[in-house]
Amino acid sequence: MFGMNILDPVAIKEILENGISLPIVVTNMRNPEKTTTIERKTINDNGHPIKIITGKKNCAILRIEDEFVHQLLNSLENKKRYSEFVILSPFTKDGIKFSRILFLDGDYVKRNEKYILGFDPLATITYNRGVITLIGDEMWRVQQIVSKTSAKIGESGLNILNIDAQEETSRIIVVVEDSTDNIEKAITAIHEERSNIKFI
């Protein structure tokens, strides 16, 4: 698993799909002595629910009609062998249901923009997005985790463009504008609030 941009279930889906209990070691590439080990099984029920906070710059969000999204995803995974994306919560506008896909590599999307937009004439892409991901254990048991996290990020002067929390993955994704040091500010803000976030 060397070289992942962000630790996410789409990157380790074979491990998850087969129910394998395998520890994952995340290494700081600038300082390889710094590592974090993530295990599927909770070692200590009283441990902190947030295990790791990651940030990724240069992302893009695709808005596409729901009826075309499966075609696109199948094509990306099977023909392009590309899976560095996360499906965000859908929305409805003017009676049309849209899906949103967060691409973790904005440069890839720019290179393949014509191909991606070719699946739906109403599809649009927004660039310059940054994503902060909170990964942990049973975060659905944590009272006000989303509100506390978003409030702290807001206090640091950042505008949150999207928050996506999924009980099944115990993951929270926060999308902000990718400019100057926004990602670093958001991560710092969450770390400052971490001590106030506890299990119910």
Regions found by a protein language model. Name each.
Residues 1-200:
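C-terminal catalytic "cap/lid" subdomain
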